[in-house]
């Protein structure tokens, strides 16, 4: 599998930039004006970045009010992270749905919370792709944004495969669906690159015993060993960690 690490760095930087004040975010190196999409009811945001004959759709990650640079050595801060980010946004909910129809024979099931968030901005994404002459779409996101980028990739392929090619670059993304979804995604989006840094805890969620499976292709970067095991699992989720190491890999 040939991986474009330069593009991975570019996508990771976009993921970092989209965490800034969303209404005024400026993406470095972008010539054309980005299209910003935001839905307050689900606190879901993405930016469509046009470049040449393609677009990159960058999904904003988990709770923007949370400081990813927090020193997780402190138990109270670690507990706050777990409550706000994991319990409320990532741990599997009881109900799951398939995105294209209520009852499907495919067996593909997906996390309801992720689907609801994506569907709240899906129409605007579809409208843009439908109304513009584009040849390729890249979806990207960090953390929760990675889950939404995964959903968007398979959705765009399903609905616009005759118009565009699709790639996905995600960083520290949680699992999105079950085996049925995994098989469908891998078949539809073969150019998918799921980066996991070190001991990133979010990439392990939701748990396998809840029926969730990761999509391909996993790309492990960074060390999976630390003397401070618990702290490292949270620190390794920061997008800055991904960017720093990917830059060293590009040289």
Give the location of each predicted region:
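Non-catalytic, mobile gating and regulatory segments of ester bond hydrolases
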Residues: 1-140, 144-251
């Amino acid at each position: 599998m040939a991986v474009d690490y330069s593009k991975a760095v570019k996508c990771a930087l976009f993921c970092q930039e989209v965490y800034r004040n969303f209404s005024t975010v400026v993406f470095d190196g972008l010539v054309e004006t980005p299209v910003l999409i935001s839905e307050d009811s689900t606190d879901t945001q993405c930016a469509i970045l046009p470049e040449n004959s393609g677009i990159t759709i960058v999904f904003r990650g988990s709770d923007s009010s949370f400081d990813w640079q927090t020193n997780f050595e402190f138990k109270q801060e670690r507990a706050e992270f777990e409550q706000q980010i994991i319990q409320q946004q990532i741990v599997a909910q009881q109900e799951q749905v398939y995105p294209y129809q209520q009852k499907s024979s495919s067996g593909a099931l997906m996390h309801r919370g992720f689907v609801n968030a994506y569907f709240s901005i899906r129409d605007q994404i579809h409208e843009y792709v439908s109304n513009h002459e584009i040849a390729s779409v890249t979806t990207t996101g960090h953390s929760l944004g990675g889950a939404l980028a995964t959903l968007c990739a398979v959705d765009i392929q399903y609905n616009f495969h005759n118009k565009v090619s699709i790639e996905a670059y995600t960083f520290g993304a949680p699992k999105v669906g079950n085996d049925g979804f995994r098989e469908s995604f891998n078949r539809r989006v073969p150019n998918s690159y799921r980066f996991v840094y070190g001991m990133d805890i979010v990439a392990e969620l939701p748990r396998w015993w809840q029926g969730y499976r990761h999509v391909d292709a996993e790309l492990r970067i960074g060390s999976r060993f630390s003397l401070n095991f618990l702290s490292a699992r949270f620190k390794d989720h920061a997008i800055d960690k991904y960017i720093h190491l990917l830059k060293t890999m590009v040289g």
